[in-house]
Curated annotation (Swiss-Prot):
<comment type="function">
    <text>Catalyzes the radical-mediated synthesis of 5-amino-5-(4-hydroxybenzyl)-6-(D-ribitylimino)-5,6-dihydrouracil from 5-amino-6-(D-ribitylamino)uracil and L-tyrosine.</text>
</comment>
<feature type="binding site">
    <location>
        <position position="66"/>
    </location>
    <ligand>
        <name>[4Fe-4S] cluster</name>
    </ligand>
</feature>
<protein>
    <recommendedName>
        <fullName>5-amino-6-(D-ribitylamino)uracil--L-tyrosine 4-hydroxyphenyl transferase 2</fullName>
        <ecNumber>2.5.1.147</ecNumber>
    </recommendedName>
</protein>
<dbReference type="GO" id="GO:0044689">
    <property type="term" value="F:7,8-didemethyl-8-hydroxy-5-deazariboflavin synthase activity"/>
</dbReference>
<keyword id="KW-0808">Transferase</keyword>
<dbReference type="GO" id="GO:0051539">
    <property type="term" value="F:4 iron, 4 sulfur cluster binding"/>
</dbReference>
<dbReference type="InterPro" id="IPR006638">
    <property type="entry name" value="Elp3/MiaA/NifB-like_rSAM"/>
</dbReference>
<keyword id="KW-0408">Iron</keyword>
<dbReference type="InterPro" id="IPR013785">
    <property type="entry name" value="Aldolase_TIM"/>
</dbReference>
<dbReference type="GO" id="GO:0141093">
    <property type="term" value="F:5-amino-6-(D-ribitylamino)uracil--L-tyrosine 4-hydroxyphenyl transferase activity"/>
</dbReference>
<dbReference type="InterPro" id="IPR019940">
    <property type="entry name" value="CofH_family"/>
</dbReference>
<dbReference type="InterPro" id="IPR034405">
    <property type="entry name" value="F420"/>
</dbReference>
<keyword id="KW-0479">Metal-binding</keyword>
<dbReference type="Pfam" id="PF04055">
    <property type="entry name" value="Radical_SAM"/>
</dbReference>
<dbReference type="GO" id="GO:0005506">
    <property type="term" value="F:iron ion binding"/>
</dbReference>
<feature type="domain" description="Radical SAM core">
    <location>
        <begin position="45"/>
        <end position="292"/>
    </location>
</feature>
<dbReference type="InterPro" id="IPR020050">
    <property type="entry name" value="FO_synthase_su2"/>
</dbReference>
Amino acid sequence: MDLMSFKEREISKKDCVELFEDTENFFDILKLADSIRKDIVGDTVTFVKNTNIETTNVCTMGCKFCAFSVSKNSPEAFKLDADEIAKKAVIAKKSGLTEVTIHGGIHPDVDTHFQVETINKVNSATSKLGGIYTHAYSPQEILNGAENAGLSIKEALKMLNEAGLRTIPGTAAEILDDEVRSDICPLKMSTKKWIDIMKTAHKTGIKTTSTIIYGHVEEYKHIVDHLSILKELQEETGGITEFIPMSFLHENTPLYKSGRVTDGASGLYELKLYAIARILFKESIKNIQAPRVKIGTKLSQLILKSGANDLGGTLVEDKVSKAAGSIYEDASVDLMKNAITSIGRIPKERTTLYEIIE
């Protein structure tokens, strides 16, 4: 296989699967991805000062890869109201953060009107401090909110956009293959519905991130199909700001407890996935994130040498990762910068939309 030819030409799904299966040219594949990264985004590695605000741990989805959710009647259940969420956003702003990511489980009582109220109260509460960027609500949360409010997806997104929502997390993608979804998250939306909501968001003027959860029951072909869907979506709408692979954190999850999965992805698999994503995406999705809070500093640094160019957020609160067994703590700005400079790259703080903060 002529690896260097992939630097100039499109790579097919068949080629991508063959790269996953190729064990002899492992380091050459990583080197190619890193070279493409350098050509497209240079040596800058970005990060964002942010926090997650988990609005509720109640969820009706019952996903087998999740260790965070509980039922509505559980003694451990919580649900923040709009004022409580706004207070957390104020604390984030006073702490010098630039972004709050607001998300939670799929609660049966949450609708679009509550989501709009939350956005309005966060914006109002933080405005006197200069405001904070609100990145909120996955496609599944938007679908749940719209259905509970009796609205179409288009109507719900329009209301959220008018309230000031400019970006949403592209989570709930998991693996964009309905056979796999019927196994690990059977109650979640179909692949087509996820794509439709993302397209509608982009057409409404709301940009999104994009994600994948890997290292569970998927096969290489599922990963490649997923990446190809994201590339096609981006080429159609241009609304994706970044790609965030999320390694399956197996401990405490139903998949692990059932014995079907004994471990998450290997380090070699993770590096290969990032590299192939960069080789496939090239300039279509320029920003690829190595989420340090989920995988740790050392693996993140290796991933930055395998096609990635972003270290993610400081994530002052990430209950989902910690519930699933993540051993990594919140990252300070100094830790982020040191992780970047120690591999010979240039750290830059960014906004949610990848604007550099000097």
